[in-house]
Structures are given as structure tokens and as C-alpha cells.
Regions:
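Electropositive nucleic-acid engagement tracts
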Residues: 43, 47-79, 130, 149-170
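Short, positively charged, Gly/Tyr-enriched micro-motifs
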Residues: 2-14, 18-39, 98-170
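Hydrophobic alpha-helical segments, chiefly the membrane-spanning helices
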Residues: 173-175
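Generic hydrophobic-segment detector
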Residues: 68, 85-86, 144, 148
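N-terminal juxtadomain amphipathic helix
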Residues: 73-101
């Protein structure tokens, strides 16, 4: 067996673990296919897609976390915003949702409930998030699917293609 050693930066540890799990799943799959028998390749495709999806989700989490800005104040559109807290929020991708901790900011001098008192999230602003955590590609894909027919048909298509996990399929109703 060939030995391959890769260095994984600390912020990508979860990505490295997901990659190792994906490789282990691949090895288990190949090891049980001997003997010349027919296989249910649709089942193999599904399993490989789910395993690769976990690696993709870990990558999205690392990238989105890197977009966080954790400082006392930021300037957005020429206006000063003050940090009001940090909390986790879900971000929805083509393969599922990831939770990312990020800072929240409010325009300096404003309070909640006032026109300028809306809380902003730099991760969402920097990533071009649509609505409540929908990353651009998943939002665009569902908007496209929904414009071709009812949202239930878009949901069925997404399920058949194996992309857009259950909670993400509902974005079509909101995009």
C-alpha cells in the first residue's frame, strides 16, 4: 500500500478528517466488490456522494469561518457599525447546512427596532448570502428550478439529483 502523508493546517483539521473518512469509505466499498458479482452501483454512487459531501461541508465551514471579522467596530458602506455579539448561524450549501460562529454588528448609535438598527453579519455580506443563510449557488439553483415549475417539483428534482439536502430544497419557496 502506498503511503501518502499530507500536512493539514490547523484551521482545516475537520476537512482533513472528512477526507480521511471519505478514503476509508472508498476502501471499504472496493474491498467488498470482489468475486465478479453484479453490484448496486446506484447505492455506491449515493454513498460516495454523501461521503464527498461531508468533505465539501467541512470545506465550506472553514471558508465561511475565515470570512468572519471579529473586531469591536467595522466600516460598511462608509458607516460605522459596532459589534453587538457573536452567535452561530446555519449557512446552506448544495450538499447541506453548516453552522458558523460569526460576529454581528449594528450601526453605531442605533438601537434594534429603529430603521438603522438592523443587525448585519459580515460573513453573509462577504459571501453574498441570500435571505437567511442561503449561499449564492444553492439559491440560484433553486430559483432556477422553481421558475420551471412548482416548488414541490423542484424539490423532487433536487432529491433525484442527490443535491440540495432536505432543508435546502425549501429555499425555492423563499427565493
Amino acid at each position: 500500500m502506498a503511503k501518502l502523508v499530507i500536512e493539514v493546517p490547523e484551521e482545516f483539521t475537520e476537512v482533513g478528517k472528512a477526507m480521511a473518512e471519505h478514503l476509508a469509505a472508498l476502501q471499504r466499498t472496493v474491498s467488498r466488490l470482489g468475486g465478479g458479482k453484479a453490484v448496486d452501483y446506484a447505492e455506491i454512487e449515493q454513498a460516495m456522494s454523501e461521503s464527498a459531501g461531508r468533505t465539501e461541508l467541512a470545506g465550506h465551514r472553514a471558508i465561511l469561518q475565515s470570512l468572519d471579522i471579529d473586531v469591536p467596530a467595522v466600516i460598511i458602506g462608509g458607516l460605522r457599525y459596532t459589534r453587538v455579539g457573536r452567535c452561530e448561524a446555519p449557512f446552506h450549501t448544495m450538499v447541506g447546512s453548516v453552522s458558523v460562529e460569526r460576529s454581528l454588528y449594528r450601526q453605531s448609535g442605533e438601537r434594534g427596532g429603529q430603521p438603522g438598527g438592523r443587525v448585519v453579519d459580515p460573513v453573509s455580506l462577504r459571501a453574498g448570502v441570500v435571505e437567511d443563510g442561503w449561499l449564492p449557488r444553492v439559491a440560484r439553483a433553486m430559483a432556477h428550478a422553481v421558475q420551471q415549475g412548482p416548488s414541490r417539483e423542484a424539490e423532487a428534482s433536487a432529491r433525484e439529483f442527490g443535491r440540495l439536502r432536505s432543508e435546502e430544497r425549501r429555499v425555492g419557496e423563499r427565493v
